Amino acid sequence: MGAPPKTAQNLSFVLEGIHKVKFEDRPIPQLRDAHDVLVDVRFTGICGSDVHYWEHGSIGQFVVKDPMVLGHESSGVISKVGSAVTTLKVGDHVAMEPGIPCRRCEPCKEGKYNLCEKMAFAATPPYDGTLAKYYVLPEDFCYKLPENINLQEAAVMEPLSVAVHIVKQANVAPGQSVVVFGAGPVGLLCCAVARAFGSPKVIAVDIQKGRLEFAKKYAATAIFEPSKVSALENAERIVNENDLGRGADIVIDASGAEPSVHTGIHVLRPGGTYVQGGMGRNEITFPIMAACTKELNVRGSFRYGSGDYKLAVNLVASGKVSVKELITGVVSFEDAEQAFHEVKAGKGIKTLIAGVDV
């Protein structure tokens, strides 16, 4: 990959094909609506989906057919506002919600805009992402930051919003026990949000010792490394070692791994709640007998919806959730591809790419 142009107006990090990226100077995007704002992007976190597109060129039905700007976990500074904008001004620091729904379909009108079939989501084909100098969003999808949240932390609001949505789907209430499978960024944030929602017992489960050690220091009250035994045996150990009685109240899977799904179902008490937040293979086997006989509440969770981003910002602003510990590396925009290699190699927790000229 060549060096970025020296005089670029809107330098962008573009995926052309599998493991084929380039820097490209693109036109500065124009405001499409009177309520739009132009954001000078300052920091962008790298998500597993970004790496998946870089490695495979597709995720399920979403296939990169034309060159696409990567990135969707971003923060920035307002550079220009539309004529009808009333809540933001030039110079405001914001967290950027990267998916714009149609606002007219039934899911949108029901407040479930994350299920909008016409969602224009950053770095999801055919829509360009946020790894550019400038990006346009509606004003109500930019969240003004209080003074105690910096722009690096603001780039973590996107995965935090994913975790907020998962925990809300689980209806976590004070006093309930929660077991979280997967101690990657979203799983770790689920632990933190569950604690903020009042759970006194949050157990993180993962196969990587380093991730578990981080989870224990960060937000989990206990950790568990599965053995190479059956899902039922691992589930029994989790229950017994953590005094969960008849089982956990809530299980969240943030891994997408089939063994985690099986173990999670067996960990739950009768009448417990299971939420699938991690995505793995399209189809897996599922312990349907246990789910039926225990009358489990089984739910999915996808991205984030109404109020999730705002709550994410409020949780950090109030000190109930901290995200700065998750930021384990920052690279310059010119070294953007390095961040993808680091994430693929499993280095650190959350790597950020600084914006152009930052």
UniProtKB/Swiss-Prot annotation:
Cross-referenced Gene3D superfamilies: Medium-chain alcohol dehydrogenases, catalytic domain, NAD(P)-binding Rossmann-like Domain
EC number: 1.1.1.9
Record has Cell membrane as a keyword: no
Cofactor: Zn(2+)
Disulfide bond residue pairs: none
UniProt pathway: Carbohydrate degradation; L-arabinose degradation via L-arabinitol; D-xylulose 5-phosphate from L-arabinose (fungal route): step 4/5
Residues annotated as signal peptide: none
Keywords, comma-separated and alphabetical: Carbohydrate metabolism, Metal-binding, NAD, Oxidoreductase, Xylose metabolism, Zinc
Matching PROSITE patterns: ADH_ZINC (PS00059)
Biological process, per Gene Ontology: D-xylose catabolic process; L-arabinose catabolic process to xylulose 5-phosphate; L-xylitol catabolic process to xylulose 5-phosphate; sorbitol catabolic process
Reactions the enzyme catalyzes: xylitol + NAD(+) = D-xylulose + NADH + H(+)
Gene Ontology terms for molecular function: D-xylulose reductase activity; L-iditol 2-dehydrogenase (NAD+) activity; zinc ion binding
The keyword Metal-binding belongs to this UniProt entry's keyword annotation: yes
Residues binding Zn(2+), per UniProt: C47, H72, E73
Cofactor binding notes: Binds 1 zinc ion per subunit.
Positions annotated to bind NAD(+): G182, A183, G184, P185, V186, G187
Recorded coiled-coil stretches: none
Matches recorded under PANTHER family: SORBITOL DEHYDROGENASE
Similarity comment: Belongs to the zinc-containing alcohol dehydrogenase family.
Function: Xylitol dehydrogenase which catalyzes the conversion of xylitol to D-xylulose. Xylose is a major component of hemicelluloses such as xylan. Most fungi utilize D-xylose via three enzymatic reactions, xylose reductase (XR), xylitol dehydrogenase (XDH), and xylulokinase, to form xylulose 5-phosphate, which enters pentose phosphate pathway.
Protein name: D-xylulose reductase A
Species name: Aspergillus oryzae (strain ATCC 42149 / RIB 40)
Name of the gene this protein is made from: xdhA
